[in-house]
Amino acid sequence: MVEKKALSYELNQDMLALIRQEFDVEELANRFCEAVAGKSKQQIENIGKEIFAQYGRELMRRTVQLGEEYPDRTYEVLKEAVDHLDGYYKFALVPQRFLEIAYSSIFELRNLPIMENSPRRLAYRITDCPIYQALAAKCGGEVAKLMACKHICLTAVDVLHQDLDLDAIVRMEASLPKDGYCQFSASKLL
């Protein structure tokens, strides 16, 4: 008798732990704070863009790689639906899955707050950001409020859509210092 493979609808915890270990938030904050010590606002922005964009790019590419290596039943069904409908639901359902993996890993979120998911737009919100908190604690509140860390999320979302061959405009719609949360969106280009 052939034993059936157990189906899991949850993200693999080993995968999440591996990403969390490889993309340690405290190490990132330390590296950034050392690099910007004594620098002007413009220099902080430039250094932040370089450091954080690289982190976001590498995070998302590793997330997609591991997400494919550790599929769950939810993802398998999602891919079947996308294939069955000739890719119609690829935007924004597939990107959402990889964003959930990335944020669940580094932020240890149970759920990523999705504000909108439609065939034309994906928007999500971050209310409690450990990267922003680490920057405020290590570099000071004024440096954190410059929001150089936004380049992590903007780059991650942009790279994700590019690598999935989805044309999208990526925006930051809200920021923690101004709005009390960060919100990012990807809008499908027609």
Task: Please provide the spans of the model-predicted regions.
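N-terminal accessory segment detector
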Residues: 1-151, 167-181, 189-190
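Conserved ATPase active-site switch/coordination loops adjacent to the nucleotide-binding site
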Residues: 164
